[in-house]
């Protein structure tokens, strides 16, 4: 769709000198979302990625110029270049951009420019960001507020991870992995929790990570709002340093928005939220696990503070379809040994894996859990090795894939073979290492039993592998 010159630049009128915006790594979830919003706003968008996929195809159909592979000629005509944190310094497009003195900015800097003219709600934290962002977006949509949202994963009910709305609201996932969330200046900031992760960014110093989160919260104006989980002792330690209005949520007695009487029936949650004015709200949540009740209560708290009515909040949570790759049920399949259910989940930190297993246990009763686990990054495997050993020992059967490197060089003792050895030595489960994923289906058929829940777990290619498995099992 062509846009007139007058229709262009409604969000950021000061960017009138910008004609074409080029994204290096445009296929990434966060990058594609921002590209889609700017494309819909009328900017010329180009971008490159190492592989074609659903996201790049959708952007191309919407009018973006997409290149597969990286080459310096791809930046021709660009007024500004946006880079993903995954892009290396020797990328030919990045090198050429600097040589031609084209401004190069991080993804979060472009998001900050879009947020500058909006009522921004930024969601940060080690776990739960994507789901919480999706929940807030769906509540505001249900309330007919038509928000713009940019999420790090698919918002299933919207069928996309980004949407350009007509209202002043912008709801966005804030990325702490490279500390780029410090560029954002929202009106409301959510912090779901904090644990050591991406420690290379913080020089291995958790205190530095905590200080960075405080800086992020200090980006709020004095009339802004910080929403923090009362169940997280690290966050509660930081509250006195925030210097802004803080509201808390959680199961804790001290929480401003307090969760009581949580029960899980199948893969749904039921609970009551006690509000600061002692109002009691009974919630039906269409996704499982106490961790999702926390995510939903953060969203509820923001909505209540904004004055959104209970009906819109409750309808959005009862109808919530989840975020992409968050306990994503791929279907039930008949195999030689019986019927099994296959679930794909993005969790790749020990805490995330643990809450996924817990939610599956509560929803699946006494059935066995068979996990296909793909470690994500050698550095994370090294830093959290003992935690991975403990949490992966909680399943009934474990298939281990090779580490998904995400561009990292191998680290001795932080590979899948070492992980398998330590898990086996713990004596609770005997993992099977599958390096050739073409053999995965055959290995599964040898070990699965009638009624098993198969969890494909990790942030790398395991999702594509599990979806390929689901397709082959349909035939």
UniProtKB/Swiss-Prot annotation:
Q: Which residues bind ATP?
A: 125-131
Entry GO CC: cytoplasm
EC number, UniProt record = 6.3.2.8
Name where it's found. Cytoplasm
Which residue windows are transmembrane per the record?
none
Q: Which domain of life is it from?
A: Bacteria
Q: In which pathway does it act?
A: Cell wall biogenesis; peptidoglycan biosynthesis
Q: Which UniProt keywords apply?
A: ATP-binding, Cell cycle, Cell division, Cell shape, Cell wall biogenesis/degradation, Cytoplasm, Ligase, Nucleotide-binding, Peptidoglycan synthesis
Its predominant location is cytoplasm
Family matches, as InterPro entries: Mur-like_cat_sf, Mur_ligase_C, Mur_ligase_C_dom_sf, Mur_ligase_cen, Mur_ligase_N, MurCDEF_pg_biosynth, UDP-N-AcMur_Ala_ligase_MurC
GO terms for molecular function, please? ATP binding; UDP-N-acetylmuramate-L-alanine ligase activity
**Biological process GO annotation list?**
cell division; cell wall organization; peptidoglycan biosynthetic process; regulation of cell shape
Provide the reaction this enzyme catalyses: UDP-N-acetyl-alpha-D-muramate + L-alanine + ATP = UDP-N-acetyl-alpha-D-muramoyl-L-alanine + ADP + phosphate + H(+)
Keyword field contains ATP-binding: yes
SUPFAM superfamilies per the UniProt record, alphabetical: MurCD N-terminal domain, MurD-like peptide ligases, catalytic domain, MurD-like peptide ligases, peptide-binding domain
Q: Which family does it belong to?
A: Belongs to the MurCDEF family.
Function of this protein?
A: Cell wall formation.
Q: Which NCBIfam families match?
A: murC
Write down what this protein is called. UDP-N-acetylmuramate--L-alanine ligase
The organism of origin for this protein:
Haemophilus influenzae (strain PittEE)
């Amino acid at each position: 769709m062509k846009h007139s010159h007058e229709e262009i630049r409604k969000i950021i009128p000061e960017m009138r000198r910008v004609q074409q915006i080029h994204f290096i790594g445009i296929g990434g979830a966060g990058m594609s979302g921002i590209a889609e919003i700017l494309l819909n706003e009328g900017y010329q968008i180009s971008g490159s990625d190492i592989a074609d996929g659903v996201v790049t195809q959708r952007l191309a159909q919407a009018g973006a110029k997409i290149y597969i592979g990286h080459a310096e000629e791809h930046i021709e005509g660009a007024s500004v270049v946006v880079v993903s944190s995954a892009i290396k310094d020797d990328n030919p497009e990045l090198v050429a951009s600097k040589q031609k003195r084209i401004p190069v900015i991080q993804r979060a800097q472009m998001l900050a420019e879009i947020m500058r003219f909006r009522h921004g709600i930024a969601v940060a934290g080690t776990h739960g960001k994507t789901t919480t962002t999706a929940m807030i977006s769906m509540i505001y949509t249900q309330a007919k507020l038509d928000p713009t949202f940019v999420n790090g994963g698919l918002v299933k009910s919207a069928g996309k991870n980004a949407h350009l709305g007509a209202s002043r609201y912008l709801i966005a996932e804030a990325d702490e992995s490279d500390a780029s969330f410090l560029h954002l200046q929202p009106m409301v900031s959510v912090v779901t929790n904090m644990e050591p992760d991406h420690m290379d960014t913080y020089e291995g110093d958790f205190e530095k990570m905590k200080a960075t989160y405080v800086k992020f919260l200090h980006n709020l104006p004095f009339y802004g709002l910080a929403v923090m989980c009362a169940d997280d002792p690290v966050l509660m330690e930081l509250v006195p340093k925030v210097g802004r209005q803080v509201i808390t949520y959680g199961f804790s007695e001290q929480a401003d928005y307090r969760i009581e009487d949580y029960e899980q029936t199948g893969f749904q949650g039921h609970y009551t939220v006690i509000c600061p004015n002692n109002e009691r709200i009974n919630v039906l949540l269409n996704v499982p696990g106490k961790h999702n009740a926390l995510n939903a209560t953060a969203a509820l708290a923001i909505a209540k503070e904004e004055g959104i009515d209970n009906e819109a909040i409750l309808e959005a949570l009862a109808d919530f379809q989840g975020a992409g790759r968050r306990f994503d049920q791929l279907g039930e399949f008949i195999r030689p040994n019986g019927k099994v259910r296959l679930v794909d989940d993005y969790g790749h930190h020990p805490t995330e894996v643990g809450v996924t297993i817990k939610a599956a246990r509560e929803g699946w009763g006494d059935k066995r859990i068979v996990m296909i686990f793909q470690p994500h990054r050698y550095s994370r495997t090294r830093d959290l090795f003992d935690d991975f050993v403990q949490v992966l020992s909680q399943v009934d059967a474990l298939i281990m894939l090779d580490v998904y490197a995400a561009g990292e060089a191998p680290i001795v003792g932080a590979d899948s073979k070492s992980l398998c050895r330590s898990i086996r030595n713990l004596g609770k489960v005997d993992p099977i290492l599958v390096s050739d994923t073409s053999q995965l289906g055959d290995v599964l058929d040898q070990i699965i039993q009638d009624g098993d829940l198969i969890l494909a777990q990790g942030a790398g290619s395991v999702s594509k592998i599990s979806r390929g498995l689901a397709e082959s099992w349909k035939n």
